[in-house]
């Protein structure tokens, strides 16, 4: 889900706190406390959710673990702060969390007015619609007059209004502040349609009483580039978070996996040796403020991008989401990482 721009007054006040939080070096603060504090969803299956024992798992959670692996060489050195759509930005601005990894859309307002840095996109998504099969609806263009469940304070809510206005359709919004309330209302039949990011619809469908009775319509009505965010003002930390994501993507392209990473250190390919820190003259890790084997530690800790995708939300998961745009650039998608050299 995606929060609207906070009011100017609140944003300005919190930005002042955020600027102070970013004035210190985030990396040194993280090392001093011994863990990365990561903001995640309160519970979205496949992306971030605790199990019965309270252990967090999911696509966004694995990115938090990847950052911890880059910094400490240990994916367990991370603590999670569950945040809802409204709390997430304040938590990041205030310094309560070090990085936000919570299915959050990169927009111009968030990148500028809120004082965040987004990069790179870890999941290309778009807003969709879920309906009951019994409605016999095949397209979102057939939804005029429908009651639509949506979370307030989100760009989902704004996109919905724009789409129906553009297509001269009428609808009745059924709005709730918290995601569990939206889920319960749709499951109870208080609305005909549920709208949010399409990946979220796949996840939320699993929680319904009768998941097989619901379908996701083909229309994607928005661009939702999702990825981690950090506070502006600390370029080193921004680089570490960014290159952690790029390392995951590059590793998949190189064919480096969690199982073969040590073996690949002996590859004759100088790009791979440089990437894994086994090239004797490499300074790539130290330039980031990390050890030269930081990328190897990331892959040891969580695997490559493809492994993370498949086990959490792909064909190896209950969601079974196709890679689509999130396939590598040379395999029909648009996931692309700059070279490590």
Swiss-Prot record:
Keywords assigned: Amino-acid transport, Periplasm, Signal, Transport
Gene Ontology BP, a term: valine transport
Coiled coil: none
Keyword Signal: yes
Annotated Gene Ontology cellular component terms: ATP-binding cassette (ABC) transporter complex, substrate-binding subunit-containing; outer membrane-bounded periplasmic space
Keyword Signal included in the entry's annotation: yes
GO MF term list: glutamate binding; L-leucine binding
Residues making up the signal peptide according to the UniProt record: 1-23
InterPro entries tied to this protein: Bact_solute-bind_prot3, Lys_Arg_Orn-bd, SBP_3_CS, Solute-binding_3/MltF_N
Compartment(s) of residence: Periplasm
Disruption-associated phenotype: Reduced uptake of amino acids Glu, Asp, Ala, Leu, Ile and Val by bacteroids that lack this gene and the genes braC and braC3 or braE and braF from another ABC uptake system of branched-chain amino acids. Pea plants inoculated with bacteroids of either triple mutant are defective in symbiosis; the plants are yellow, have increased numbers of small pale pink root nodules, dry weights similar to uninoculated control plants and 30% acetylene reduction compared to plants inoculated with wild-type bacteroids.
Role noted for this protein: Part of the ABC transporter complex AapJQMP involved in uptake of L-amino acids. Affects the efflux of these amino acids as well. Essential for the development of bacteroids, the differentiated legume-symbiotic forms of this bacterium, and for the effective N(2) fixation by them.
Protein family per UniProt: Belongs to the bacterial solute-binding protein 3 family.
Record text on subunit structure and interactions: The complex is composed of two ATP-binding proteins (AapP), two transmembrane proteins (AapM and AapQ) and a solute-binding protein (AapJ).
Protein name per its UniProtKB record: General L-amino acid-binding periplasmic protein AapJ
Gene (UniProt): aapJ
């Amino acid at each position: 889900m995606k929060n609207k721009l906070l009011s100017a007054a609140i944003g300005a006040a919190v930005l002042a706190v955020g600027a102070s939080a970013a004035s210190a070096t985030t990396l040194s603060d993280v090392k001093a406390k011994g863990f990365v504090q990561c903001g995640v969803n309160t519970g979205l299956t496949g992306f971030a959710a605790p199990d019965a024992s309270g252990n967090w798992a999911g696509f966004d959670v694995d990115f938090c673990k990847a950052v911890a692996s880059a910094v400490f060489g240990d994916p367990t050195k991370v603590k999670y702060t569950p945040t809802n759509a409204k709390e997430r930005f304040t938590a990041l601005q205030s310094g309560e969390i070090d990085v936000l990894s919570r299915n959050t859309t990169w927009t111009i307002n968030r990148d500028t007015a809120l004082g965040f840095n987004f990069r790179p996109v870890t999941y290309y998504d778009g807003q969709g619609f879920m309906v009951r099969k019994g409605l016999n609806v095949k397209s979102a263009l057939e939804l005029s007059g429908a009651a639509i469940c949506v979370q307030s304070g989100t760009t989902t809510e704004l996109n919905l209004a724009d789409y129906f206005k553009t297509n001269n359709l009428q609808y009745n919004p059924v709005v709730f502040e918290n995601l569990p309330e939206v889920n319960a209302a749709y499951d109870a039949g208080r609305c005909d349609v549920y709208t949010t990011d399409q990946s979220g619809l796949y996840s939320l469908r699993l929680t319904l009483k009768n998941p097989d009775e619901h379908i996701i319509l083909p229309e994607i009505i928005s661009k939702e580039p999702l990825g981690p965010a950090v506070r502006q003002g600390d370029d080193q930390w921004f680089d570490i978070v960014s290159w952690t994501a790029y390392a995951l993507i590059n590793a998949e392209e190189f064919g480096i996996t969690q199982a073969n990473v040590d073996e690949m250190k002996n590859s004759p390919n100088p790009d791979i040796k440089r990437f894994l820190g086994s090239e004797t003259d490499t300074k790539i890790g130290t330039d980031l403020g990390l050890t030269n084997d930081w990328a190897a530690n990331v892959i040891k800790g969580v695997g490559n991008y493809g492994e993370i995708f498949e086990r959490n939300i792909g064909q190896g998961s209950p969601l079974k989401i196709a890679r689509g745009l999130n396939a590598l650039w040379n395999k029909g998608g648009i996931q692309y990482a700059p070279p490590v050299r």
